[in-house]
Amino acid sequence: ANSVCFTFTDFESGQQDLIFQGDASVGSNKALQLTKVDSKGNPQGGSVGRALYTAPIRLWQSSSLVASFETTFTFSISQGSSTPAAALTFFIASPDTKIPSGSGGRLLGLFGSSNNAGSDNGVVAVEFDTYPNTDIGDPNYRHIGIDVNSIRSKAASKWDWQNGKTATAHISYNSASKRLSVVSSYPNSSPVVVSFDVELNNVGPPDVRVGFSATTGQYTQTNNILAWSFRSSLMGYQAN
């Protein structure tokens, strides 16, 4: 479709319009639990989960016909261990995307160890990272980053994660300016802003799926999406 619009005010188990991968499920609290928790709600280590909107979305048709989109979601991350880990992402990928082998922990459920810097996986992601891995290029603080076909963020800003609190994220892409922008905040705190210019028609296929991924490692955290809305519109303009 040339334009797509959907809203989830909460989630249901057996949700037909979502594809669940790995450990992702819907909890009794009607939240999208991207990673595994035990019967008491305690997060489990070594978990990878993803959830994608079922219908593919037409992101571009030609270099001069590229979609603009915006998405807003609320989420919460609660630490299970003394240190939380690892991350939650909103991502865009090819319609047949699966969890890559070996993509747990620091690789966000998006990049296998073999292709974490490849240009062929067509992945664009916004990561909310509670555990800096400086050896793979993370800044040495908790951050929100924009990833394009690589685990190494193209742009990142410091993020003051708040344990168990509900955050709001707003991500938009302007196809005329080619700017991907992220604004995220907790109640009563200053928003974190990150942006990066990217030509989405040069990154991945015309049709994509959108959704969320999350991981835990040796250290753990819950990764819950509470509500989600998305809309996109394919508009013609003169691209360079």
UniProtKB/Swiss-Prot annotation:
The residues that hold Mn(2+) are 127, 129, 138, 143
Q: Which UniProt keywords apply?
A: Calcium, Disulfide bond, Lectin, Manganese, Metal-binding
Binding residue positions for Ca(2+): 129, 131, 133, 138
Q: Which InterPro entries did the record assign? A: ConA-like_dom_sf, L-lectin, Lectin_legB_Mn/Ca_BS, Legume_lectin_dom, Leguminous_Lectin
The keyword Phosphoprotein is annotated on this UniProt entry: no
Which Pfam families does the entry link to? Lectin_legB
Q: Name one GO molecular function term.
A: carbohydrate binding
Family, according to the entry, reads as follows:
Belongs to the leguminous lectin family.
Q: What does this protein do?
A: Binds preferentially to oligosaccharides bearing the sequence Man-alpha-1->2 Man-alpha-1->6 Man-alpha-1->6Man found in early steps of glycoprotein processing in the endoplasmic reticulum. It binds weakly to highly processed oligosaccharide structures.
Per UniProt, subunit arrangement is: Heterotetramer of two alpha and two beta chains; disulfide bond linked.
What else does the entry mention about this protein?
A: Binds one manganese (or another transition metal) ion and one calcium ion. The metal ions are essential for the saccharide-binding and cell-agglutinating activities.
What's the protein here called? Answer: Lectin
Q: Which organism is it from?
A: Leucomphalos mildbraedii
